[in-house]
């Protein structure tokens, strides 16, 4: 059974070209299912049926696994069995028709426009790291990039004259995004400094030694910027979430936001409509003469 799992992971890496983060998550989830099969003395993937999987997910939920994590695991199982069926190893999918336990949907954390301005307009010291970090912050918020898209960005994907960036997203899908004027200015300052490091490849964002920045370095730098400017933790996806929320709030164009984010399914984008409603509810509560004020007595 383990050799089939190894072969599937190799297929995901070489054929599907999934990101290392996604591959690690799939392997972790499927390894849990494999351990369950071995404990239940199932010797083949054909021996796993919907009742086994239902029992397994219920136990995982009781042990504190969130509904979101279980949904991801079931998605991994479906993809795995699709592969097994195509290879002639199995003739069924035990996850077909199985849904994870429903849980409370967590809304993504965002910065409001004032806090975003406070972060980006905090002032930049005249040194290599400060200008690089400012360009990273501006580009993440300007174009709503994923962290993997930012770290994989090369010089030939940037067109500062026309204000465009081409990124390679999930599933090796490319999309072209606008780059705002503030981000362009920050990049125009950063790129000459980058050239002084004698870069080892065409990466847009490099270290002082000219090496491409990895995800962990960017996460650490953004966390430091958040604590310094806002007194709170900041992670790259928070700027992507803020980009989406602010754009939807201003434009009300869900399809356009979906295209900019690179979401295959508009249901993924719809979570930002909940954030927009929260904003509208706040405006209503503060502006409507008949809105119930906090602490006001019931009529």
From Swiss-Prot:
Localization (cell): Cytoplasm
Domain of life: Bacteria
Record's GO cellular component terms: cytoplasm
GO biological process, one term: chromosome segregation
PROSITE patterns (UniProt xref): CB, TYR_RECOMBINASE
Pfam families (UniProt xref): Phage_int_SAM_1, Phage_integrase
This protein's UniProt keywords: Cell cycle, Cell division, Chromosome partition, Cytoplasm, DNA integration, DNA recombination, DNA-binding
Residue ranges of every copy of the Tyr recombinase domain listed in the record: 106-285
SUPFAM superfamilies referenced in this protein's UniProt entry, alphabetically: DNA breaking-rejoining enzymes (SSF56349)
Active site residues per record: 146, 170, 237, 240, 263, 272
PANTHER family for this protein: PHAGE INTEGRASE-RELATED, TYROSINE RECOMBINASE XERC
Family, per entry: Belongs to the 'phage' integrase family. XerC subfamily.
The protein's assembly and partners: Forms a cyclic heterotetrameric complex composed of two molecules of XerC and two molecules of XerD.
Role noted for this protein: Site-specific tyrosine recombinase, which acts by catalyzing the cutting and rejoining of the recombining DNA molecules. The XerC-XerD complex is essential to convert dimers of the bacterial chromosome into monomers to permit their segregation at cell division. It also contributes to the segregational stability of plasmids.
Name by which UniProt lists this protein: Tyrosine recombinase XerC
Organism: Pseudomonas savastanoi pv. phaseolicola (strain 1448A / Race 6) (Pseudomonas syringae pv. phaseolicola (strain 1448A / Race 6))
Lineage: Bacteria, Pseudomonadati, Pseudomonadota, Gammaproteobacteria, Pseudomonadales
């Amino acid at each position: 059974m383990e050799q089939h799992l190894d072969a599937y992971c190799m297929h995901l890496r070489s054929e599907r070209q999934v990101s290392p983060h996604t591959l690690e998550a799939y392997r972790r989830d499927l390894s849990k299912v494999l351990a369950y099969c071995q404990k239940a003395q199932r010797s083949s993937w054909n021996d796993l049926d919907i009742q086994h999987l239902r029992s397994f997910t219920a136990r995982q939920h009781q042990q504190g696994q969130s509904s979101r994590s279980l949904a991801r695991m079931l998605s991994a199982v479906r993809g795995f069995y699709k592969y097994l069926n195509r290879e002639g190893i199995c003739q069924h999918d035990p996850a077909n028709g199985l849904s994870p336990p429903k849980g409370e949907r967590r809304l993504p954390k965002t910065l409001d426009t004032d806090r975003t301005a406070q972060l980006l307009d905090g002032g930049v010291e005249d040194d290599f790291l400060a200008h690089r970090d400012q360009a990273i912050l501006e580009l993440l918020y300007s174009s709503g990039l994923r962290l993997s898209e930012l770290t994989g960005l090369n010089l030939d994907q940037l067109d500062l004259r026309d204000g465009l960036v081409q990124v390679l997203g999930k599933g090796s899908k490319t999309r072209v995004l606008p780059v705002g004027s503030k981000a362009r200015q920050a990049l125009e300052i950063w790129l000459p400094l980058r050239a002084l490091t004698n870069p080892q490849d065409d990466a847009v964002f490099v270290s002082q030694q000219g090496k491409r920045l990895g995800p962990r370095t960017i996460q650490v730098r953004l966390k430091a910027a958040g604590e310094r400017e806002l007194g709170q933790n900041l992670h790259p996806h928070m700027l992507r979430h803020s980009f989406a929320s602010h754009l939807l709030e201003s434009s009300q164009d869900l399809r356009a936001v979906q295209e900019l984010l690179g979401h295959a399914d508009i249901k993924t984008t719809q979570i930002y409509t909940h954030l927009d409603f929260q904003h509208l509810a706040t405006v209503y509560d503060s502006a409507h003469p008949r809105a119930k004020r906090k602490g006001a007595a019931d009529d």
